[in-house]
Amino acid sequence: MPHLLHIDSSLAPEGSVSRGVAEAYAESWRKHHPDGTLTHRDLATSPPPHLNWALVSGGQTPPEQRTPEQAEAVKIREEYLEEVESADEYVISVPMYNYAYPSTIKAWLDQVIVMGRTAGGTAGDGVLAGRKVTVITAQGGSYAPGAPKEGWDHQVPYLRHAFEALGADNIEFITVVMTLSKVNPALAAFTDVFEASRTAAEQTARDRAAA
């Protein structure tokens, strides 16, 4: 049966744009896959451990020789790995924080990128090869060509490389821009741009989930 892994990372439990678009994806997916399995992990409410020496050293130590700290770190990583390995489709929502991504997303990727197991280093070589990956991003402004802060987007480029390292060769980014136009007076003129961007993103998400 189809299995969707749904990852959220926004700190906001309500009103989050990235969560909203990801939920539109999940709702459409459930509608079109009534017998499927959906696993949801919220990295904001249950943050993964950041990479630490117990995990790094424990992964290089035979199981019977691991310290209790190493064994626990490896056990936690195994839970994340099994979630990724058992799914065959993924939707990940990622807001932009300070021109990048939440630290919980980096921590999660550090848990699941394991060379020789889930990662081969290039698209088509890794656990995500042949599986549909959809990344929902929300950005307070716009970093498109010609924008005042063109080149400041350190979110999408990194995430694309990270997921390709996991083998992703069917990946789509759905981005909502100008999310701060509702709260920042300096961006108020772009409210219509934001609303149109969000509406388009939600429809794109629904359509991709149904495909």
From Swiss-Prot:
Keywords: Flavoprotein, FMN, NAD, Oxidoreductase
Cofactor binding note from Swiss-Prot or TrEMBL: Binds 1 FMN per subunit.
Binding site for FMN: 10, 16-18
A GO molecular function held by the record: oxidoreductase activity, acting on NAD(P)H as acceptor
Origin: domain of life: Bacteria
EC numbers, comma separated: 1.6.5.-, 1.7.1.17
Enzyme class at the top of the EC tree: oxidoreductase
Alphabetical list of InterPro entries matching this protein: Flavodoxin_fold (IPR003680), Flavoprotein-like_sf (IPR029039), FMN-dep_NADH:Q_OxRdtase_AzoR1 (IPR050104), NADH:quinone_OxRdtase_FMN_depd (IPR023048)
Catalytic activity: 2 a quinone + NADH + H(+) = 2 a 1,4-benzosemiquinone + NAD(+); N,N-dimethyl-1,4-phenylenediamine + anthranilate + 2 NAD(+) = 2-(4-dimethylaminophenyl)diazenylbenzoate + 2 NADH + 2 H(+)
Homology family: Belongs to the azoreductase type 1 family.
Subunit comment: Homodimer.
Chain's role: Quinone reductase that provides resistance to thiol-specific stress caused by electrophilic quinones.
Protein name: FMN-dependent NADH:quinone oxidoreductase
Species of provenance: Parafrankia sp. (strain EAN1pec)
